[in-house]
Amino acid sequence: MQWLKEVWIIPNQIWISASIYCFKSMNSDQKPKINKSFATLSSRQPALTLSDSVQHALAITKRGVDELLIESEFAQKLARSELSGIPLRIKLGLDPTAPDLHLGHTVVLNKMRQLQDLGHTVIFLIGDFTSMIGDPSGRNITRPALTKEQIEDNARTYFAQASLVLDAERTEIRYNSEWCDPLGARGMIELSSKYTVARILEREDFTKRFKAGTPISVHELLYPLMQGYDSVALRADLELGGTDQKFNLLVGRELQKDWGQEPQCILTMPLLEGLDGIEKMSKSKGNYISITEPANGMFAKVMSISDVMMWRYYELLSARSLAELAQFKIEVAAGRNPRDIKVALAQEIVARFHNQQAGFDALADFDNRARGGIPDDIPEMQLSGAPLGIGQLLKQANLCASTSEALRMVEQNGVRIDGAAISDKALKVEAGTFVLQVGKRKFARITLS
């Protein structure tokens, strides 16, 4: 393959100088060495002194991160950007594997917004092509690939929801099918030659599956390469991802060197713990807060986290400055009720995804429920079968997932009818209209016949 044929697979951008033309006659053994020499040019440049504004930008970038690799390189990127006036290109790729985002997803989006507010170009990359492969990160089994129709359906809501965090007008939206589809078989083989199977198997999840004899499909081995190639196509200066994405992000650095680009730095964000404070936030674990959740429910769920976990949520989700957070901690240590600080966090999160008034209203609703009051907007339903056992009643009212769970709630004094606590698991509820309550947040107005 001639040298110039490597250039066309980078979409919409062709970087050809006079020096590149002279490489056309070189054999393939010579080219990688020449390529990598391009990528090291920046390392030969004298280090720039970091201005106060660059150091401030670096501090904002590092807030709450798990790793910033390589920090000294990124500091120099920031300094060169300030000197040249050319913003850095910041990349975040998301495969639209599910149609809705939760607060755990917004951890990395918040970091993108911080970098966006520093004046850099943020690229919201929708992995419509890689979704058809299925990211194996953190998996002990092959992730099912999505159909094109599923991907399109999920992608429709992705950016709309992400825009609740990002400034949509200043965000570049790209789809990796732009450059992955044109690759074809020849381009895919060429890309695959850039990395060895041994190196890909260094990934912890692949290593575990290989040792356990769990099948690893060939297409899964391609995923890190495809994600890395996205960085080549976009000429990314920094790529963001979760801690489970570190291997894939590092592949991007190596591929950029092979294509003669300055390698991107990588920034990994920690995975946000869910409401239980133990497992990572996940829909499958039921410990999540959806960003499309009603304001009152969102507020109440934030208030349910522990006082210790509150600081973690502040660090990863709040737009408040580090100085403000430090002051909050001083006040709590001096005796201020942590509930006050948690209320401020809950209102901030509700205001971001709804509006400020919704935050005030959610607080009023939460306080009313805490005093034993009944919300105004509770669901109403009609049921039959009176007299009906309390366990069946709670299940049919969708206030408990099962009769066994319902009876446990009765044992724990967590069930009320018209405000009166129920302690009899054998209770048969007669016909009538009444308010049924489970815990502090679940209500239903029942007409039983």
Language-model region placement:
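Divalent-metal (Mg2+/Mn2+/Ca2+)-assisted nucleotide/phosphate chemistry catalytic cores
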Residues: 65, 145-268, 275
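Active-site-proximal loop->helix
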Residues: 131-146, 161
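Conserved nucleotide- and phosphate/pyrophosphate-binding catalytic cores
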Residues: 255-449
